[in-house]
Swiss-Prot record:
One of its GO terms (biological process) is translation. The gene is mrps5. InterPro entries: Ribosomal_Su5_D2-typ_SF (IPR020568), Ribosomal_uS5 (IPR000851), Ribosomal_uS5_C (IPR005324), Ribosomal_uS5_N (IPR013810), Ribsml_uS5_D2-typ_fold_subgr (IPR014721). SUPFAM superfamilies: dsRNA-binding domain-like, Ribosomal protein S5 domain 2-like. The keyword Ribonucleoprotein applies. Keywords: Mitochondrion, Ribonucleoprotein, Ribosomal protein. This is Small ribosomal subunit protein uS5m. One of its GO terms (molecular function) is RNA binding. The lineage of its organism: Eukaryota, Fungi, Dikarya, Ascomycota, Pezizomycotina.
Length: 477
C-alpha cells in the first residue's frame, strides 16, 4: 500500500513539474527548489532513512562536557586542582633534597610550562606502568634517555676450549659466585719475629726468638682453622639455579662468554678440535654418490647390502588405500601402502606403512619390504613345491606348481610377486574373498610355507631322489 501511494505521489509530482511555465527561469528557480514536489522527486525509491549523519567513532572519547570543561572558569578550576603549584612547604622539602642549582631549574620549568595547556592538550596515564614523572615523550633527552649500549660481537676465531681451558673457566665461574668474605694472604713464620731478623735466615735466629715465633705461629694457625671451619659452615655454595645457568648459558668456546646482538647463534666451525673424525657423516664415500641424502644408511647396517645392491632390487606398490581416522580433532586422512621387494632370484619381502603423505608412505613401505626379505623355496628355480593352500581372514589362496613353459596364470598382484621372487611357472586360485590386501598377505604366507622335500625325507627316514632328473639324465633346470 505504501509503495503504491509513493508511486502515485511521484507520478503526480512529475505531472505538476511539466505544467510549470518555462518563462522567467531566474524567478522560478527559487520557487522550484523549495517546492515539496521537487524535493519528493529528488528522493530515492526506497523507504530506508538517509545515512547522512557523521560516522560514530569506534573508540569511546571523554568529552569536555563530561569533564566539566565548558567555560574558562571551570577550566581554571580543573587546572588548579589537577596541576597545583608548589607550596612553600613543598619547596622547602625539595630544597632539602636538591641543591640550589636544581631548585632554580625546577622553578624555571614550572614557569615555562603552562598548566592550562596540560589541561586542554595533555594526556595523563593512570595505568600501573606509568612513568614517575610527566613527559609527552615527543623528543629524546640525552640526559634521561640513555642509548642502548651494544656489546662487541665475539671473535670469529673462537674455538672450543680444551680440558685445561675448561677447568680454568670452571674455577673462574666458581670464584664469581663464591659467597662470603674475600680470602687474604696467610701469614708466615717470618711475620712473628722482630723486624731486625726479617732479612736473616731462620738458622741465624736466636733460640728464644725462634721458640716465641713458633708459639705465636701455631696459635695463629689454630685460630685460622677455627675461622675457616666456621665460615664453611655458614657459607652457601652455588645453587641449583646457578649450576643450570652455567650449563645452559655459559659458552664452551674461547670467546670470553660474550653474547652477540644478533638473534642467530654463531655457526660451528668446519672442523671441531677434539671431535674431528668422530662424528658420523651422512655421505659414505663407498656409495659412489648414490645416497647423498643418507636414506639407505640404516638399511645398509640391517641388511649388509651396499647401496648399489639395494637400488638393483625390484620393488612394486601393490595396494594403496585411502584411510580416514576419526579423532577428537576431526577426521585425519592418511595413505596406507603395501609394497613388495625382491631380487628376482628367490628372495621376496613385504612391507606396509601409513602416512599423511603418500610419497612418505611409499618410501617407508619400500624400506620395510627390503628389510623383511626372506628366501622363497623354488623347484628348479622356476616354480613352487607341490600345492599350497593358505587362509588369511576371509581369503583362501591355492597355489599349484606347473611344468616348464606353463607361465604365470595368476592375478596381476600375484604376478608381480612371482616376478620379484623369480617364479616363472605357477597357477593360483582364490576360493573365497578377493580382498587385495588379504590376497597379497595370503600369497606371501603360502610361498613361505611350502612343503620342503628334504624335511619329508628326513621325517620318513628314506632317501629322496628327483625322478625328473633321473629320467632325463640330469638334463633339466
Amino acid at each position: 500500500m505504501s509503495a503504491a501511494r509513493f508511486a502515485a505521489r511521484s507520478f503526480l509530482s512529475r505531472r505538476l513539474a511539466a505544467t510549470v511555465p518555462a518563462a522567467a527561469p531566474a524567478a522560478s528557480t527559487p520557487a522550484a527548489s523549495t517546492c515539496p514536489a521537487a524535493q519528493q522527486q529528488q528522493s530515492q525509491f526506497h523507504s530506508s532513512a538517509h545515512l547522512e549523519a557523521r560516522r560514530r567513532s569506534r573508540f569511546k572519547n571523554v568529552r569536555a562536557v563530561e569533564m566539566g570543561l565548558t567555560s574558562d572558569a571551570k577550566i581554571e578550576s580543573f587546572t588548579k586542582k589537577k596541576f597545583a603549584e608548589y607550596t612553600e612547604d613543598e619547596k622547602a622539602a625539595l630544597a632539602h633534597n636538591y641543591p640550589a642549582e636544581h631548585m632554580e631549574a625546577i622553578e624555571a620549568a614550572e614557569a615555562a610550562i603552562d598548566p592550562k595547556d596540560l589541561t586542554i592538550q595533555g594526556r595523563l596515564r593512570v595505568d600501573p606502568y606509568r612513568m614517575p614523572y610527566i613527559d609527552d615523550f615527543s623528543e629524546i633527552q640525552p640526559i634521561i634517555d640513555k642509548r642502548a649500549r651494544r656489546s662487541a660481537p665475539p671473535s670469529h676465531k673462537a674455538r672450543f676450549m680444551d680440558v685445561d681451558e675448561f677447568t680454568q673457566d670452571l674455577i673462574n665461574w666458581a670464584d664469581e659466585i663464591r659467597r662470603g668474605e674475600p680470602t687474604h694472604r696467610m701469614k708466615k713464620l717470618r711475620d712473628f719475629v722482630p723486624e731486625e731478623f726479617f732479612e736473616k735466615p731462620e738458622g741465624q735466629w736466636p733460640k728464644d726468638v725462634r721458640d716465641e715465633a713458633f708459639t705465636k705461629f701455631w696459635a695463629y694457625l689454630k685460630e685460622q682453622k677455627d675461622a675457616d671451619a666456621k665460615a664453611a659452615a655458614n657459607a652457601t655454595g652455588p645453587t641449583d639455579g646457578d649450576i643450570l645457568s652455567y650449563i645452559l648459558e655459559r659458552s664452551s668456546m674461547t670467546d670470553n662468554n660474550l653474547q652477540a646482538n644478533s638473534s642467530l647463534a654463531p655457526a660451528l666451525p668446519d672442523k671441531v678440535p677434539g671431535v674431528e673424525g668422530k662424528y658420523r657423516n651422512a655421505i659414505d664415500p663407498a656409495d659412489d654418490g648414490l645416497d647423498d641424502k643418507g636414506q639407505y644408511q640404516e638399511l645398509k647396517k640391517r641388511t649388509g647390502m651396499s647401496v648399489r645392491q639395494i637400488l638393483q632390487l625390484k620393488t612394486k606398490k601393490l595396494v594403496h588405500r585411502r584411510v580416514v581416522n576419526q579423532t577428537r580433532l576431526g577426521k585425519i586422512a592418511s595413505d596406507s601402502v603395501m609394497v613388495i621387494a625382491g631380487n628376482g632370484d628367490g628372495w621376496l619381502g613385504l612391507g606396509m606403512a601409513k602416512s599423511v603423505e603418500a610419497s612418505i608412505a611409499v618410501e617407508k613401505a619400500t624400506l620395510l619390504a627390503i628389510q623383511n626379505m626372506q628366501p622363497i623355496p623354488r623347484y628348479e628355480n622356476r616354480t613352487i613345491y607341490g600345492e599350497v593352500t593358505t587362509k588369511v581372514s576371509g581369503t583362501i589362496v591355492r597355489l599349484n606348481s606347473r611344468p616348464p613353459g606353463f607361465g604365470l596364470r595368476v592375478s596381476h598382484r600375484i604376478f608381480e610377486m612371482c616376478r620379484a621372487a623369480g617364479i616363472r611357472d605357477l597357477s593360483a586360485k582364490f576360493l573365497r574373498s578377493r580382498n587385495p590386501m588379504n590376497t597379497v598377505k595370503a600369497t606371501y604366507q603360502a610361498l613361505l610355507s611350502q612343503p620342503n622335500p628334504e624335511d619329508l625325507a628326513i621325517g620318513r627316514g628314506k632317501k629322496l631322489v628327483d625322478v625328473r632328473k633321473v629320467y632325463y639324465g640330469g638334463s633339466v633346470y
